[in-house]
Amino acid sequence: MEQSLNIRYIYHSSFSLEFEDKIIIFDYFQGTLPKNVNDKKVIFVVTHSHADHYNESIFDYENASDITYIVSEDVYEEIFDYDTKDNVVFLGEDNIEDLKKHFGKKVIKLEVGESTSVYGADFTALGSTDMGISVYFEANHLKFFFAGDLNNWVWEEDTEEEKEKMQQDFSKEIDKIGHVDIGFFPVDPRLKERYDLGVNEFVDKCNPKVLFPMHFTKDPTIVDTFIDTHDYEGCKVVNMKKEHDTFQVIIK
């Protein structure tokens, strides 16, 4: 029986993957979250605590009755940072409400190498060349990879040694992924002419059938440039750069 998957662009590196039975939302920090979820279950995934990938307002999301949060270790520690609290603070009214809010949620900490299954989707945390994790996951017979801040971050001012180290670290992580059907990967214009080093290697080694460029913030023209200058065999690059842009996948 055919199923549909709607992938909707929210902002920067945030997407919602809207299956018939669940919605998976990655790295939300601003924009409009899904409102009409009906009886679908919702999974928020947060790869790290950078301000352009995480907003604690996700814990105030009330449009679904069944919500699970999968977060990296640094985000988890930020949520449950009790080492910095003393007994007086714990007894404060605001902090009690904060504890109630977070303990009432299903929050799963996912460290590199760990896996978890939620609502029929299987998630595995892989490494990053920046902060936090990247995520490989399988859902509804499809294989996905969401890079988070995993990229070949080679900057103009880097030394040759730094560039070589970054290349080695990046390739080491990419080699762990394997084939995927759908990938989400940075094309950051701040890297200038090196912006496609990471995504080129990802496509070459992981052979995604569909690729979603991300991490371009206020410069969406990089997506047009990327599509105009790259023609990957067997891989469709999706041009989604405005909020609510949607791409539909039919699952057979």
Sequence positions of predicted segments:
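Core dinuclear metal-dependent hydrolase active-site scaffold
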Residues: 1-39, 97-179, 243-252
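Short active-site oxyanion
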Residues: 4-5, 23, 65-69, 209-210
